[in-house]
Design a protein with these regions (language model features):
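Catalytic phosphate/metal-binding cores of nucleic-acid and nucleotide-processing enzymes, i.e., regions
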Residues: 1-152
Length: 152
């Protein structure tokens, strides 16, 4: 099925985001290592059992960029769409990964994910992704109960 024929969803936003990443690997060679973690999705009972045996876990973020930048050791992005919110397991995972030194955020669009990824890639030294310029430019906010950056 062509992307243009698909109804807009988390899946289409993730496809658009990963297409952008693949098309910018010449500009940002480290994007070669960005990847989707297939922990979600609906599977039949047999396939779900096999994936669980293989190590699939609930709550793991959608996208991993295991490349250190600024003060971070890597980046996790959870993509959502519409009114979807992170599950309790996703919030725990994001908090744990932040404590381990990763930058973690929830993005509600491919465009938002691209913007925060570009900001992350361009970090230098011990820089963080929570300065005023980031707030102004990327509509950065931390959800009061989740404690995780949310990018629109």
């Amino acid at each position: 099925m062509k992307l243009a024929d698909m109804k807009r969803s988390e899946d289409t936003e993730q496809i658009l985001f990963m297409q952008w990443c693949r098309s910018h690997e010449d500009e940002y060679p480290q994007l070669h290592w960005i990847h989707h973690i297939p922990n979600g999705g609906n599977r039949n009972r047999k396939e779900a059992a096999k994936f669980k045996q293989m190590g699939v876990k609930a709550g793991i973020a959608d996208i991993c960029f295991p490349y250190p930048k600024g003060r971070y050791v890597g980046m996790y992005i959870e993509l959502k769409y519409g009114d979807n919110i992170p599950t309790p397991q996703q919030r725990v995972f994001m908090r744990e990964m932040e404590l381990a030194g990763h930058y973690c955020c929830i993005c509600y669009s491919a465009a938002g994910a691209v913007r925060v990824l570009q900001e992350y890639i361009n970090l230098s030294g011990g820089a963080e992704l929570n300065g005023a310029s980031f707030e102004e430019e990327f509509e950065y906010r931390v959800h009061k109960t989740w404690g995780i950056p949310v990018i629109n």
